[in-house]
Amino acid sequence: MKKAKIFLCSLFLLLPCSVKALESDVFPELVYWSAVRSGELNKIKSFLQNGYNPDKVDGSKLAPIFYAVKIGNPEMIRILMSHKAKVDIEDPSGNTPLILSARFPNLEVIDILLDFGADINHQNREGTTALMRAVEFGNFFVVRRLLDANPDLLLQDFGGRDVMMLSAQGRNKKIQNTIEKLYNKK
């Protein structure tokens, strides 16, 4: 009997084994966040369809929509929003995806966020709005697009600066002239 056990154990060890474990079976969280950070839409869709929370944050306390904004992926934003992601979710600094998007010249991303109801007047923990951020970064076309959403031009950050002050401190004369014209109308 002992020889039979040894034989069976030896046979088991010597025969090729075809057991496969997919990375997604062993480390689904890692696969999900890797897909989010690289914008792999099919993988993201699959995870969301299988119940993943579109607002779950990673170790950096960022929800997937922030990565979609950073990499400028409008389709990823649409996918997340179709799975009920929060358009005004905050990062640890109180920034929303719209405030983050104001740094980048991707008007399609901004349009999608606004279409899904992003709060144009949301202020982060420093009191900065998306318009203020766009002015600071000198993104004229982003500033124009955000102005079309009728932001409150009188809001101030917690340093007491409003959009007019920020535009005067900036180097972009087109932004400064545009903001001045709006203030003069009021």
Over which residues does each language-model region extend?
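Intrinsically disordered, low-complexity regulatory segments in ankyrin-centric signaling systems
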Residues: V19-N50, G59, N184-K186
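Ankyrin repeat A-helix N-terminal signature
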Residues: S34-G39, Y67-N73, L100-N106, R133-N139, ...
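Ankyrin repeat structural motif
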Residues: E40-L48, N73-M81, N106-L114, N139-L147, ...
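Alpha-helical adaptor scaffolds
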Residues: K70, D91-D111, D115-F116
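Leucine-rich solenoid repeat scaffolds
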Residues: L153-K185
